[in-house]
Regions:
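Arg/Lys-rich, positively charged N-terminal/basic patches that mediate binding to nucleic acids
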Residues: 1-27
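A short, surface-exposed loop/turn module that caps and links secondary-structure elements
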Residues: 29-56
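Alpha-helix boundary/capping residues
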Residues: 16, 28-31, 90-91
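Generic leucine side-chain signal with a strong bias for well-ordered alpha-helical environments
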Residues: 16, 24, 45, 72-74
Length: 92
């Protein structure tokens, strides 16, 4: 499966510690194996899926879009607080 990333996603990953990146990698592997694992959003974020996972003690969300059967676009990762508000600002 082909994985595309946005600049917003890259910036967020750059700030993570090694253990946090390991937990993010595990979540990405889960999504690649099961693209339907995330919760489908409606309204302004139609077409976006959000996958919830733990990064240490923190509940985090990973927003992604399945472009076709073979391509996955990772949009944003971060803590739950104000996540959807920030996602609306970055995603047209």
């Amino acid at each position: 499966m082909r994985i595309l990333v946005t600049p917003t996603f890259e910036r967020a990953v750059k700030k993570l510690h090694k253990q946090q990146k390991a937990s993010l990698d595990e979540s990405v592997r889960t999504i690649v194996g099961q693209p339907e694992a995330g919760e489908t959003k409606v309204g302004d974020l139609a077409g976006v899926k959000a996958y919830k996972f733990r990064m240490g003690n923190l509940l985090c969300l990973l927003a992604y879009r399945v472009l076709d059967g073979n391509t996955l676009k990772l949009l944003m990762v971060g803590p739950q607080e104000n996540f959807y508000r920030d996602l609306k600002r970055t995603e047209p």
